[in-house]
Structures are given as C-alpha cells and as structure tokens.
Amino acid sequence: MVEAIVEFDYQAQHDDELTISVGEVITNIRKEDGGWWEGQINGRRGLFPDNFVREIKKDMKKDLLSNKAPEKPMHDVSSGNALLSSETILRTNKRGERRRRRCQVAFSYLPQNDDELELKVGDIIEVVGEVEEGWWEGVLNGKTGMFPSNFIKELSGESDELGISQDEQLSKSRPEGFLPASLLPFPAHGAKGKTTFEGTILYRAAPGKTEGHRRYYSLRETTGSESDGGDSSSTKSEGANGTMATAAIQPKKVKGVGFGDIFKDKPIKLRPRSIEVENDFLPVEKTIGKKLPPATSTPDPSKTEMDSRTKTKDYCKVIFPYEAQNDDELTIKEGDIVTLINKDCIDVGWWEGELNGRRGVFPDNFVKLLPSDFDKEGNRPKKPPPPSAPVVKQGAGTTERKHEIKKIPPERPETLPNRTEEKERPEREPKLDLQKPSVPAIPPKKPRPPKTNSLNRPGALPPRRPERPVGPLTHTRGDSPKIDLAGSALSGILDKDLSDRSNDIDLEGFDSVISSTEKLSHPTTSRPKATGRRPPSQSLTSSSLSSPDIFDSPSPEEDKEEHISLAHRGIDVSKKTSKTVTISQVSDNKTSLPPKPGTMAAASSGPASLSSVASSPMSSSLGTAGQRASSPSLFSTEGKPKMEPAVSSQAAIEELKMQVRELRTIIETMKDQQKREIKQLLSELDEEKKIRLRLQMEVNDIKKALQSK
C-alpha cells in the first residue's frame, strides 16, 4: 500500500479530484502516468497531482514508529514492598536499531517563522527529511521544525556508530532497569505521611529474581506472624500464573502491619534488606560514578573530528559563469565561492559542490581551486529562500485544466539525468563546449591594402564619371561620320585603359572649362607659308573631304602637338595647376570647341569639321609617324574663317608626353604581371588536380577493401 504526505495545498477543480492540505496523508494510492495519482483521504477517493505530495517510503514509516515509545501502564507496588514491577519499561533505543541522519549546527540561526528551529553552534539535530531545496526538517531538544541546510554540517555514518556504541556502553555500565527518581511509581505511605521511598534511588531487578522475591514476600505476608495472629493473610493472594495481584489494602483494627506495630513510639525505619536484595540493588554512588565519565568524554571525539573536517574543507572560486543545463547542476556566476564536496564524480571533468544551500555538479574548468588556508567563516552563508508558495503551482495547474478537457498535470521539473553511463557523456560535452566562455576574441585585423607594385599601382580606383552626352552632329557627307567613329573608338579604348589603372590622373570635366572672350592666335601664324600647299583647315568643305590629301598626306609631330595644345587651351587658361589630362578628354574637347563666328555660310558645318579635324590628326599620327607636312598653317588660301589658337606653355606639352610614356610603361608592366599570375594559377590548378586524383584513387581503394571484407 503506497502512502504519500501532502506538501502543498490543492483545491479540487473537478468532481473527481481531491482537495488536499499540507500535512495530510493520502492512502491506497494508485500511481498513473500523466502526473495524476489516485488515492483516498478521509474516506473519499479521487485524483490529485503527484508533484504536490511526497511519497512515504517504508524506511520513513519505521522511523516514525520507532520514535513512538511504547506506553505501558505503571503497576502499583505492594504496600510493604520496595520492589518495582517488571513491566515497567524505560524508553530506550534498541541495540539493533540505527539512528537517523544527524547534523551539527555550524552557524547560529534565529527562527523567522513558528515552524522553524532555533539553532546554536554545536547543537546536534536529527534529520527527519529534506522538505525543500535548502530547507530540512529535523528534531532538536524534542522540538520538530524546519532549518536551513547551509547552516549545518552533516555528520557521517562513523560518528553515528560512535554515538550508538557509546550509548550501548552506558547501558551496559548500569544495571538493567535503571529508573530515575522522577519516574518512580507511586510509593506506599507509612505513618505520619512519610514515604518508604523517600531519599532513595532504586533500580529494577532482573525479571527472574524479581519473581522469586515476590513469592518470598507473599509467603511471609500470607503466613503472617505469630505475634500478629496471622490476620494479614486475608490481604494478599497470589494468582495461578505466579504473578502477584495487587489488591487494595483493607484497614484493620490491629496495630501495625505484618510483624506487628514495629514503629510504635519510634521513628519509621525501613525493613532491613536481605543479602540477595543488596546484590540486586547497586548503590547509587557506583552507578553515578560509572555513568558520568562516558557522558563527559562523549562530545570530545566528535568535536575534534568536526574541527578536523572543517579545517580540511576545500573551496573554489568561479572564474567563468555557467548556466545549469540539468536539475542536478549548479548555476554559478563569476566570483562565487563554492564549497567543494566531492572531486571524484562519475563524470570526468565535473565536481560536486554546494552554493547558497543548493548542492549540484559543475564543470571543474570553470572554477579555480582556492588555497587550503582560505577562511570562509567570515562569509556567513545567506539564508536560503523560504519554501515557495504553492499558489504558483496551483495557478499553473488550474489554468491549464480550464482550457483542456482531459486532466493535464501542472508543470513538473525534468528528471535528473543519469550520468552513470559513459556513452551519454559525449552528448553532454558539446553543450559544455557551447556554453563554456572563453577569453574575449581578438578583434579582426584591419584589411590590408593591396600589394603595390614598383610603379605605385593604386589599390582602389575612383568611380568613373558618367560620360557627357554629345550633341547631334550635322554631317554634310556620309564619310565624315566614319572618321568621327574612328576617333571616338580610339579615345574610348584609351580612356578605358587609363581609368582602370590610375587614380593619379585628374578627371577634369567639361564643366570646369571657362569660356574666354579674348581672341586666340595660333602659334604658327608667324611661320612662313608654302605656296601651292593646302594647310589643314578648321572647316572642311565637301570638296576637301573628298580629296585624298587628308588621309594620304603625312602628318608631322609638330602638328599633332599643336592640335593637342589647341584642344586644351581652355583647361590651361582656367586651371594652371592641372597636371594630367586623359587622351579621351583631348578628343572630346576638340569636338566641344566652339568655332569663331564668321561671315561665311560654311560656318554651319563647323561641328562636323571639328570632329573630323580632331579625329584625322590622331589617326594619321598613329599610322604615319615621323613624316612632316609641307605646310603647318591652319589658314586656307580661299579666305575661309580662321581660328586663332591659344598660346600654351611648353611645360604642359612635356608633361603630357611624360604621362603618355608612363602610361605605356604601366600597361606593359601590368601585362607582364598578368602573364606571371596566370602561369602561377595554372601551375596551382595542375597541382590541385593531381591531389584530387590521388585522393580519388585512395577512396576507391578503401571502398574496394571494405567491399572485400
């Protein structure tokens, strides 16, 4: 039959449930899965949550029964007999009975509630049970109550056995049936109200001898005395079972009792005792002498043992916080001082300790062992939290029951994990590794700038500016767009190469060009003109476009330089500090130069002629370098509108030449570097292919070996 004691109140929510209160005992329990048990209380049977009660085990029942001393009635003593009844039994522990757990108070504690015990340092408490985490129930000086578990030190089994053996020695040292004066039965009264037992301490004789003494005194009283006339025989009678029946003494007219009036006109004296009685009843001095020394020497071994234990207790300090993953683990925070209980746990790498009244295991690499001379006495333990109010659990249970038809138990804690099996340890370790804190990670390194070559290759290029839209050009013939396309294609290629490889070149837009009202003069106006030669003009007619002189005549380097300086005259005038200009901008600037207003009708074809002029020198200079033209003049003999070019400094031209040469060098260097990198990548790729083939062969061999087995 299973029984359980109620630990928390619960109010029945349905008809088939039991209303239970703290302290009640539920009997005839039938355990069922799902968190609800069925039991009987006060004649009513119903369901109740299993986590609101604590099952009473057989061992606990025996302890409860052993605590109740057998109460037997005290028997009367015959009027003239100083012997005690053999049925008088003292409340002593049996020899074969083991004591319950005991603990010694390490810190004093004043009770905060009525059900708590007052603890003083050195008190010994008998533990009844662990009612709640951090709170135990025990007996101290006959009072049962609650006390905090972290204010005491539990005594081991050796000290309990020591106490039992000492009690056994005490019981052996005194005669059987020792009875203090406060527990004596009612004495027989003599004359003048004085008792026959006054001022004496008696002992119970052995059962066999007691029976003989009863028969002896009963025979003496039944036969009576000759001087007395034998009338006392009517006062006593002995039963068939040999035990003396204590009957009420009838008052007589005779003087005296038994042997006559022996106390007539004399003080009352006790009857002289026989030799057998003296042997059975030991003097008080002897018993006291044997009794006191063991009692005085008893606490010394336990105290010294406890002192040695407290001195050897180890402590450890938490250096990394850890959150408990299971119910039997401790949640530790950085800086906490944990009392170490056991280092040799079932699981390797885990220690058992106590913190704030709670015992559990924790990882040993999260703490640091403190030196043996560390003193924790100054750090008084904190009082554990009081027993949690059961209202929370009731609420958890009732709210869930309202929403569901079938009974669902209130939330109960998960079961403790079984660490005895070694195979469960690998599953535990990943959690530990995840939760284990480490030294703060080093911040990531700053991104290294890309390796620069010997020519100061830039690490990051600025974003390209959007190209300026070119206005529509009016072409007089179909050949002029071809020339413009050739020039624009060349400028686009050069612009792409330069923008990808250099950020030292300043990107100047056309927005920075400031128009000037001054008339510009061409630098070659003062040169002598050759007759019969057509100079390159700013505006070309249809006849001039059709003539082959534009494409067949050689273009001198001086003319190329003059065209470049003419195209950049706006930039040189507006910004003297500008040092670099892209070739693509040179070609674009040439097309954007407005023609000088003239009186001729040919001015309408200005944009087309400008684009053709801009593209033709570039294309001709690439194809026929090193040949000179007969006439560098821009003025035609037919009186067409003339352009007066701006005067540019020779230093700007030299800078442009140097930049072009530098760009060519950069391009060649980049080509060589790219070739080397491609070769290196190809060689690494070949090595990786070889490694992969080798691994594939090894895998195939392993597969074959496994299949053959």
Swiss-Prot record:
A Gene Ontology molecular function term of the record: molecular adaptor activity
Post-translational modification: Monoubiquitinated by CBL and CBLB after EGF stimulation; probably on its C-terminus.
Keywords associated with the record: Apoptosis, Cell junction, Coiled coil, Cytoplasm, Cytoplasmic vesicle, Cytoskeleton, Endocytosis, Membrane, Phosphoprotein, Repeat, SH3 domain, SH3-binding, Synapse, Synaptosome, Ubl conjugation
Domain SH3, residue spans: 1-58, 98-157, 311-372
A biological process from GO: ubiquitin-dependent endocytosis
Modified residues (Phosphoserine): 156, 159, 227, 274, 480, 553, 555, 565, 631
A Pfam family matched in the record: SH3_9
Gene Ontology CC: cell-cell junction; cytoplasmic vesicle membrane; cytoskeleton; endocytic vesicle; focal adhesion; GABA-ergic synapse; glutamatergic synapse; neuron projection
Entry's localization field: Cytoplasm; Cytoplasm, Cytoskeleton; Cytoplasmic vesicle membrane; Synapse, Synaptosome
Low complexity compositional bias, start-end: 221-239, 535-554, 600-623
Phosphothreonine modification, residue list: 298
CDD domains: SH3_CIN85_1, SH3_CIN85_2, SH3_CIN85_3
Record field: compositional bias (Basic and acidic residues): 399-434, 561-575
Coiled-coil region list: 646-708
Region (Disordered): 221-242, 289-309, 372-485, 511-650
Residue ranges with Polar residues bias: 513-528, 579-592, 627-636
Membrane topology: Peripheral membrane protein
Primary location group: cytoplasm
Assembly behavior: Can self-associate and form homotetramers. Interacts with CD2, F-actin capping protein, PIK3R3, GRB2, EGFR, MET, BLNK, MAP3K4, PDCD6IP, SPRY2, ARHGAP17, ARHGAP27, CRK, BCAR1, SOS1, ASAP1, ARAP3, HIP1R, SYNJ2, INPP5D and STAP1. Interacts with E3 ubiquitin-protein ligase CBL. Interacts with CBLB, but does not interact with CBLC. Two molecules of SH3KBP1 seem to bind through their respective SH3 1 domain to one molecule of CBLB. The interaction with CBL or CBLB and EGFR is increased upon EGF stimulation. The interaction with CBL is attenuated by PDCD6IP. Interacts (via SH3 domains) with ARAP1.
Function: Adapter protein involved in regulating diverse signal transduction pathways. Involved in the regulation of endocytosis and lysosomal degradation of ligand-induced receptor tyrosine kinases, including EGFR and MET/hepatocyte growth factor receptor, through an association with CBL and endophilins. The association with CBL, and thus the receptor internalization, may be inhibited by an interaction with PDCD6IP and/or SPRY2. Involved in regulation of ligand-dependent endocytosis of the IgE receptor. Attenuates phosphatidylinositol 3-kinase activity by interaction with its regulatory subunit.
Protein name in UniProt: SH3 domain-containing kinase-binding protein 1
Species annotation: Mus musculus (Mouse)
